[in-house]
Amino acid sequence: MKIAFPAIFRQEKDSDAINIVFPDILGAVSCGYEYENAMFMARDLLKASYKCNFDNCRSATPSSLSKMKKLFSGDTIIMIEVDV
């Protein structure tokens, strides 16, 4: 089964660190260093959120990309899809 949720990627100002948040999933927060690592961490976080916090993740409804882009206009928004 595949699940997909929008992730917010926010670059730290004086660092390679990228903060990652899934606003639709309570507590789903991580970080990565540079784009490739941040994407890996986002996928890993989404899988872990589904497996470890099954009820919260399963009951969450993914927001649309357009809604997220309005709410987080200064950040990068990417729909992350994983097999669970």
Predicted regions and their residues:
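N-terminal segment of the canonical double-stranded RNA-binding domain
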Residues: 1-16, 21
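Short, charged, surface-exposed hinge/linker loops at domain edges
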Residues: 1-5, 40, 44-84
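Generic beta-structure capping elements
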Residues: 12, 23-25, 81-83
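A short, exposed loop/beta-hairpin motif centered on an aromatic-Gly-Thr core
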Residues: 26-37
